[in-house]
């Protein structure tokens, strides 16, 4: 039964925002699973041939993980007003443990649906939400613990492996698949691509070491995994505020984020029309969407933290769960007894959610209602398969405050809540700092693994120094690469505007690319199977002066091309054996190639003579003067 509403009248949405895009020299391909509707996307980067004196030698295509959804598929028509295809709808329906509700369960959701003042903002193609049948649990963890491999788990296995095992027997990939041994620091990574099986995924989900955030009402989702024994993922933030940003901008920013590689998106909206903004984003997002429900609950009180109630928060959880939010940041570890521990901090409590709950606790002199009602929250989560992202409301806001009693006290409470959530078979990840100098990062990872039982860690950086406003994507990227290697499963990006203002599209791009670098560096360090393939391909292209391949194999082809063309814009420069840094006379790679070519061109007799002289020199004790 569908609910209809007038389409949004934003001019940019009416013109479809033109969100389709194509990556250079790339094709969109799909891996098919055990059933035809398990179609896992990947991007294949095509390479040009290597020119040699003997002719052209072809270079093979390079498969890469793809987060862009249908937006980069030339065969799919995108209509933002209709939303994306419901990839998971059939899987969910076949399981037979959910039911379509006759209407919305949330009081606030019903009010918004019937409010004529918001009709022009509303997403038009809404369907009634699903919920677990009475007594049922529909979480991926519940299925995994029952020994069931879901289509979502099979999808993840194919997505993580990229079917790289098929390349190992092909001679054209032999050199490209060489990889330095990693140091997984105790993690149980698969050793080879063929080890990334649906059963491996099931075991990781069942143990709680990984999650598949996949609300049953987010059928447009392309399933992915967050866990220490998978590829390191990154999250991008968006959201309107009371100061700036519009609904259309946020939809555009979501598509822009996944274009550059965001694995998940958090909608942190705090301004007008939070409900409508989230609906548009969800219906058009192929990646998991997370929120901080306390932000919207606070908005319902007019911004007065003391007026928050459990009933109001509960209604907000149900409202967002029925829209399809995949994971909730919930600051249930901010306990009354921890708040005084922040009094001597340099920057106090910097988490918005943490400060809201701290203020509520102090105003009422009661324990955090998110903590006291945690079991009831779990009942909601497992009815829709919403994952917990247990918030670090007492994270340090500067390196001076790192690793203090407030931070680690809350972390231990998050471990207690993790165990409680797992009794309900609810999926959990743990949020982490923040601002931590390099020498104190390892302690954060050790504490999380010990007290939170290896639940996936999800960190904001951390920023390793506080002296670089405007460059905090770099200060945090350094920490992110390190903690990613140590075991963090997902890295929350930081943009250059951190601490300064709301990021625009270019800031988002800069933050995502920075964090893609950090995540990939962590994968290399851990020894993720096949992680070095793209590095090797780009290095080979660089040595052979295949400029277009260098651009296209990079994380940001547009930026690389523009930097090259700033000094050598002519098309002929794209095949030149030098760049503007060294010029044609001093290029080390060009000189090395000339030396190789010279050695290869010498007659066999000359080579043999040089080898004989070399042996003679060694027999004489390698002395220059005798």
Swiss-Prot record:
One record GO biological process: thiamine biosynthetic process
> Any idea what this protein is called?
Phosphomethylpyrimidine synthase
Q: Which cysteines are joined by disulfide bonds?
A: none
Keywords on record: 4Fe-4S, Iron, Iron-sulfur, Lyase, Metal-binding, S-adenosyl-L-methionine, Thiamine biosynthesis, Zinc
A GO term for molecular function:
4 iron, 4 sulfur cluster binding
Q: Which Pfam families match?
A: ThiC-associated, ThiC_Rad_SAM
Q: Which family does it belong to?
A: Belongs to the ThiC family.
State its Enzyme Commission number(s). Answer: 4.1.99.17
Co-factor(s): [4Fe-4S] cluster
Q: In which pathway does it act?
A: Cofactor biosynthesis; thiamine diphosphate biosynthesis
> Entry cofactor note text?
Binds 1 [4Fe-4S] cluster per subunit. The cluster is coordinated with 3 cysteines and an exchangeable S-adenosyl-L-methionine.
**Top-rank taxon:** Bacteria
What InterPro entries has UniProt attached to this entry? ThiC, ThiC-associated_dom, ThiC/Bza_core_dom, ThiC/BzaA/B
* Cellular component terms per the entry's GO annotation: cytosol
- Broadest EC class? lyase
**Which positions in this protein are listed as binding [4Fe-4S] cluster?**
579, 582, 587
Q: Which reaction does it catalyse?
A: 5-amino-1-(5-phospho-beta-D-ribosyl)imidazole + S-adenosyl-L-methionine = 4-amino-2-methyl-5-(phosphooxymethyl)pyrimidine + CO + 5'-deoxyadenosine + formate + L-methionine + 3 H(+)
């Amino acid at each position: 039964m569908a609910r209809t509403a007038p389409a949004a009248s934003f001019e940019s949405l009416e013109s479809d925002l033109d969100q389709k895009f194509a990556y250079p020299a790339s094709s969109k391909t799909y891996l098919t699973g055990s059933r035809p509707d398990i179609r896992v996307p990947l991007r294949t980067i095509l390479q040009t041939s290597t020119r040699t004196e003997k002719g052209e030698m072809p270079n093979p295509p390079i498969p890469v993980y793809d987060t862009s959804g249908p937006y980069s598929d030339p065969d799919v028509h995108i209509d933002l007003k209709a939303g994306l295809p419901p990839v998971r709808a059939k899987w969910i329906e076949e399981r037979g443990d959910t039911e379509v509700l006759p209407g919305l369960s949330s009081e606030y959701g019903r009010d918004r649906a019937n409010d004529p003042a918001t009709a022009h903002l509303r997403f038009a193609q809404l369907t009634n939400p699903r919920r677990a049948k009475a007594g049922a649990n529909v979480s991926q963890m519940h299925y995994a613990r029952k020994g069931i491999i879901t289509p979502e788990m099979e999808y993840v296995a194919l997505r993580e492996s990229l079917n790289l095992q098929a390349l190992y027997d092909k001679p054209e990939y032999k050199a490209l698949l060489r990889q330095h041994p990693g140091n997984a620091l105790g993690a149980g990574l698969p050793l080879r691509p063929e080890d990334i099986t649906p059963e491996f995924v099931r075991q990781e989900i069942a143990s709680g070491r990984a999650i598949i955030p996949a609300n049953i009402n987010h059928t447009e989702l392309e399933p992915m995994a967050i866990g220490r024994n998978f590829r390191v993922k990154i999250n991008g933030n968006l959201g309107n505020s009371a100061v700036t940003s519009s609904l259309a901008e946020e939809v555009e920013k979501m598509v822009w984020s996944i274009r550059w590689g965001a694995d998940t998106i958090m909608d942190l909206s705090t301004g007008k029309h939070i409900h409508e903004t989230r609906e548009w984003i969800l219906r058009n997002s192929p990646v998991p969407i997370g929120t901080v429900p306390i932000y919207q609950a606070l908005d319902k009180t007019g911004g007065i933290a003391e007026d928050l109630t459990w009933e109001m928060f509960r209604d907000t959880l149900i409202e967002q769960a029925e829209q399809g939010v995949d994971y909730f940041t919930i600051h249930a570890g901010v306990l009354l007894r921890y708040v005084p521990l922040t009094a001597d901090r340099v920057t106090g409590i910097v988490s918005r959610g943490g400060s809201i709950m701290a203020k509520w606790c102090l105003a009422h002199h009661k324990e955090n209602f998110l903590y006291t009602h945690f079991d009831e929250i779990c009942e909601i989560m497992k009815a829709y398969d919403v994952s917990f992202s247990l918030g670090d409301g007492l994270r340090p806001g500067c390196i001076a405050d790192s690793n203090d009693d407030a931070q680690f006290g809350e972390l231990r409470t998050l471990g207690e809540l993790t165990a409680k959530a797992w009794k309900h078979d609810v999926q959990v990840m743990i949020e982490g700092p923040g601002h931590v100098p390099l020498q104190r990062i390892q302690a954060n990872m050790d504490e999380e693994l010990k007290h939170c039982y290896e639940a996936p860690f999800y960190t904001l950086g951390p920023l390793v120094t506080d002296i670089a406003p405007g460059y905090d994507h770099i200060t945090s990227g350094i920490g992110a690469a390190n903690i990613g290697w140590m075991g963090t499963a997902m890295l929350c990006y930081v943009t250059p505007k951190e601490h300064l203002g709301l990021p625009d599209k270019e800031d988002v791009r800069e933050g995502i690319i920075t964090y893609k670098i950090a995540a990939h560096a962590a994968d290399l360090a851990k020894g993720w199977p096949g992680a070095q393939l793209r590095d090797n391909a780009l290095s080979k292209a660089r040595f052979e002066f295949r400029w277009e391949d260098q651009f296209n194999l990079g994380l940001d082809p547009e930026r690389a091309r523009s930097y090259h063309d700033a000094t050598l814009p002519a098309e002929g420069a794209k095949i030149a054996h030098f760049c503007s840094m060294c010029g044609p006379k001093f290029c080390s790679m060009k000189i090395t190639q000339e030396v190789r070519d010279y050695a290869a061109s010498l007659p066999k007799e000359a080579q043999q003579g040089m080898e004989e002289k070399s042996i003679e020199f060694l027999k004489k004790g390698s002395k220059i003067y005798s």
